[in-house]
């Protein structure tokens, strides 16, 4: 809490200061915002955030495929673990051993479309009849912390 220095007295809390409750979640590594990259987990690093953010872990974004959603290279995205997400939700997903952050859409033919928020990137389709890759939703993006000022 910011303090107001008082001459000859102990400092007093600033009258407009709002106390913020913080906690830490593991920063598990990086996630692709571009082409999927190998998913590695490192539980030794954590990142602080407010108690009001309901998430289980964080990932550092690599790439520019989500810039139209205001998620930039180097940003930290906070993920709430869940197996399914609603259409259009930004989610961390795993394709085989590669993780990526994209908007997720379920198509009428049963496939999943993973759509970037940058028109320079083509959608990724998974789950077709000839697709032997494994696909899993890791969780929903619930917040992000930007390094851009």
Language-model regions, residue ranges each:
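Short, positionally conserved secondary-structure boundary motifs
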Residues: 1-72, 87, 98-99, 106-111, ...
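Well-ordered beta-strand positions enriched in small/hydrophobic/aromatic, beta-favoring residues
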Residues: 59, 91-93, 114
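Thr-Gly-centered strand-to-loop micro-motif
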Residues: 61, 79-80, 102, 116
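Short histidine-centered beta-strand/loop micro-motifs
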Residues: 69-71, 82, 103, 125-126
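Hydrophobic beta-strand signal
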Residues: 77-79, 92
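Short, Lys/Arg- and Gly-enriched loop/turn segments at beta-strand edges
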Residues: 84-92, 100-101
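Short aromatic-glycine motifs in intrinsically disordered, low-complexity regions
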Residues: 92-94, 122-132
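PDZ-domain C-terminal substructure recognizer with occasional recognition of PDZ-binding tails
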Residues: 100-124
